[in-house]
């Protein structure tokens, strides 16, 4: 399947080469495409769908636990109904009022459960938090998960802090309204509308920032989490307004589902909300990884031939086991190149029909390595040859074997690169001294 984001990035990179003096413009074009490519590669749309169904099952337990925590603070007594109104007014479109009524009824019934029933609800809520944890750690490429006790404390902190922040937001709103209503501070009359209008955005920004900073098992810089929170809050408000307008003005679901339209509408809204959350997470992670990825990709061009051989070797090894490798898996096998570096090698290899994607989106060899030579690889995309001395110094078996062939190429490029990739991958390295000759092509490189 063709990758439209990758194709766009290639075109933008070509344009960027002509804008050598305008680095900020190249970054402004390439960074959003970098985020979009990571979003696609991390299967965020599929993860958003999974999280939507998980949220639908855990929503009543979450509200029950949140209201219980909220009621435990005397300062918030009597504000339960106002908190629910605040929650639904600012987090869901106006067209899902029917869902609000049903959820309030469900929460009221859940409040009468026994201790065992409440524990079961808590498990449902924690399972949803665990699903969020997996999605976030996949975005940050975190392999090691938290210890169970540490993870439970993080989840419980999120469940506890959310009602408190909402209660504080509601308390500030009530204070501003009461002050202006009784005319104690006329100067606040203009400030009232500003505070009330901006408070949902501020609360959403704080919530998203906390989510991006606390949930990944990774030290996320606070400024990156804050920028991601601002972006997610802005996208969330835009999505809420746009989706609310669509449902109100284009009543497709009401015409099809009738009285049951609220359920698919609410489910779609949950899906859009999680898409926004994951976009913000990818943006937050990209703020830290983009500069490193650019640096690695810049160095990859000088080492592209070696990396191409190594990528083909990893695919050859995986194919002997009857499987392919994803881009992410190849990036983990070649961490020095990074994702952008590996992608810069995969694209020309695919154009040369040396590799292809299988039905599962994994890379596999498309040529028989016993008949595909180093010369074929060199001529396919004119990869620059690496230094033999550098390969000898720090290389592994594959690098040493490649160095043998390049050393032979000093006396004849065609004969030296006539060796097949299968020979490179199966033969043990034969250590030979580096032959230094005048005007040696590989040494000059």
UniProtKB/Swiss-Prot annotation:
InterPro entries in the record: UPF0761_bac, Virul_fac_BrkB
Membrane-crossing residue ranges in chain numbering: 56-76, 112-132, 152-172, 195-215, 225-245, 259-279
The protein's name: UPF0761 membrane protein Mlg_0521
Similarity-based family: Belongs to the UPF0761 family.
Predominant place of localization: membrane
Entry keyword DNA-binding: no
Organism: Alkalilimnicola ehrlichii (strain ATCC BAA-1101 / DSM 17681 / MLHE-1)
Keyword set, alphabetical order: Cell inner membrane, Cell membrane, Membrane, Transmembrane, Transmembrane helix
UniProt topology in membrane: Multi-pass membrane protein
GO cellular component entries: plasma membrane
Location relative to the cell: Cell inner membrane
KW Membrane (keyword) present: yes
């Amino acid at each position: 399947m063709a990758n439209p984001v990758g194709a766009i990035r290639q075109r933008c990179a070509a344009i960027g080469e002509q804008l050598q003096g305008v680095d900020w413009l190249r970054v402004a074009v390439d960074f959003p495409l970098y985020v979009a490519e990571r979003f696609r590669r991390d299967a965020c749309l599929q993860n958003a769908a999974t999280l939507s169904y998980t949220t639908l099952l855990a929503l009543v337990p979450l509200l029950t636990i949140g209201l219980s925590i909220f009621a435990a603070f005397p300062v918030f007594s009597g504000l339960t109904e106002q908190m629910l109104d605040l929650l639904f007014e600012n987090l869901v479109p106006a067209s899902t009022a029917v869902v609000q009524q049903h959820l309030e009824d469900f929460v009221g019934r859940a409040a009468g459960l026994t201790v065992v029933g409440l524990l079961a609800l808590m498990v449902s809520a924690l399972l949803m938090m665990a699903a969020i944890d997996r999605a976030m750690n996949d975005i940050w490429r975190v392999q090691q998960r938290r210890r169970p006790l540490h993870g439970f404390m993080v989840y419980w902190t999120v469940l506890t802090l959310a009602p408190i922040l909402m209660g504080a937001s509601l308390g500030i709103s009530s204070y501003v309204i009461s002050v202006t209503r009784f005319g104690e501070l006329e100067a606040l009359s203009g400030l009232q509308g500003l505070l009330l209008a901006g408070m949902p955005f501020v609360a959403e920004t704080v919530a998203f920032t906390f989510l991006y900073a606390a949930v990944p098992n990774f030290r996320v810089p606070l400024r990156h989490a804050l920028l991601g929170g601002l972006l997610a809050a802005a996208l969330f408000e835009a999505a809420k307004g746009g989706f609310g307008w669509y449902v109100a003005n284009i009543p497709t679901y009401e015409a099809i589902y009738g009285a049951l339209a609220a359920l698919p509408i609410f489910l779609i809204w949950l899906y859009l909300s999680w898409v926004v959350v994951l976009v913000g997470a990818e943006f937050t992670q990209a703020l830290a990884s983009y500069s490193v990825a650019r640096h690695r990709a810049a160095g990859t061009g000088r080492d592209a031939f070696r990396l191409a051989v190594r990528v083909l070797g990893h695919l050859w090894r995986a194919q002997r086991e009857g499987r392919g490798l994803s881009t992410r898996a190849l990036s983990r096998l070649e961490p020095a190149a990074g994702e952008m570096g590996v992608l810069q090698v995969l694209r020309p290899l695919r154009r040369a029909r040396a590799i292809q994607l299988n039905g599962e989106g994994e890379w596999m060899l498309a040529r028989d390595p016993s008949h595909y030579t180093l010369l074929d690889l060199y001529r396919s995309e004119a990869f620059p040859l690496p230094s033999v001395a550098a390969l000898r110094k720090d290389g592994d078996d594959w690098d040493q074997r490649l160095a043998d062939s390049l050393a032979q190429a000093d006396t004849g490029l065609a004969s030296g690169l006539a060796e097949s990739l299968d020979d490179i991958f199966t033969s043990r390295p034969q250590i030979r001294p580096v032959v230094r000759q005048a005007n040696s092509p590989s040494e000059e490189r």
